[in-house]
């Protein structure tokens, strides 16, 4: 792996380096060309952002600048906040998948901003979102345990149900907006 992982956070996460390597193994190596490091810190240290944005921003991509290669920052205090046991249990259980989503989104930003041609700035967000969904699906199938293997035969029906519920939700929102006017 040619992406360096630096941990500069007071939050200790078990097997963080190994998890990052497994996540990056899903992505083709050509997409990581020029992406030098991922820094894990407590908060994103960007002076141009307000304190409120820094406290809630999970990650930030720094594109290639003069004399500096592309790199990324991940805020572990946003992904795994220090709370009492019952509140932090859910965030700890979903930390691996949240970490995968964040890292894949950073790689997608790097790929579409530096390596991919033909993507306009107004198409960047949708392209990154589809990239993350595609690679996250591959990661989940590779890393998923018993639950993923048990639910795989039912996935088409569950996806169909999710689409149907999403359309009903949109119709309901449209009806509410029309009734407000």
Question: Residue spans of the language-model regions?
Answer:
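A metal-dependent hydrolase signature that marks the N-terminal structural subdomain at the beginning
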Residues: 1-73, 90, 169-181
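Long, well-structured alpha-helical subdomains associated
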Residues: 2-4, 14, 137-181
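Hydrophobic (often cysteine-bearing) scaffold residues that line and stabilize catalytic clefts
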Residues: 16, 96, 100, 124
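Helix-hairpin-helix/helix-loop-helix acidic hairpins
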Residues: 82-89
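Short helix/strand-bridging catalytic loops that position acidic/His residues to coordinate divalent metals
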Residues: 90, 113-122
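Active-site recognition of the HExxH zinc-binding catalytic motif
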Residues: 97-114
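An active-site-proximal "capping" alpha-helix that borders the catalytic cofactor pocket
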Residues: 122-138
